[in-house]
């Protein structure tokens, strides 16, 4: 791995260098490194994580450069989410775009370790890495493999809002911890690393949700919540697990 780290140090330098070295030399070295590093290898995954450090320094400029890295590895491969990458580039190339402004706020105002975990789990695992596995599984099983899995940990809710199905149909339906854990483990085998919780109110089960975040630290979790069960203790736990 020492050689790999040295290569990645050169690679990161070339990708983000802004000095006076010949542009032609830099471009040729970039091409050489891209050619010799297989995009599915652990080395490339490590390199992209390393590149995250550069985003922290200047998100507006270096986020664009990071997408350039991904584009170089993806090439014209139809399995590498070309349409999604193009849509993302339109957003980051337009500073007046609302999504662009939201991303910059997240990068600048959110705890650094939380942003790092989101980068690794959402951008790398759920997209760059997971998508390739999903495509392989779609061909293997001749069926669709979802990009994300949505599940209801419980139908219970601490509120009784007029018109909401949770208030009308009761709160007796629950997935056990082991059932949710099994869904996530099976999903990861298919390349799925993004899980969305709805309900009911998912935070009725917040101890289980934190435990699942801790166990599946390579996944990204999103929860639709009414927010009333978020307290200081739970906020500290979310900061601790980061995903």
Where are these regions (language model features)?
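N-terminal [4Fe-4S]-dependent radical SAM core
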Residues: 94-150
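Core AdoMet radical
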Residues: 148, 167-175, 190-205, 213-230, ...
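N-terminal accessory interaction module
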Residues: 58, 66-105
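Non-catalytic protein-protein interaction scaffold segments in large eukaryotic complex-forming proteins
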Residues: 22-62
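Conserved N-terminal glycine/acidic-rich loop preference
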Residues: 123, 130-132, 137-145, 162-163, ...
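Short hydrophobic targeting helices and cationic amphipathic motifs
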Residues: 3, 8, 15-17
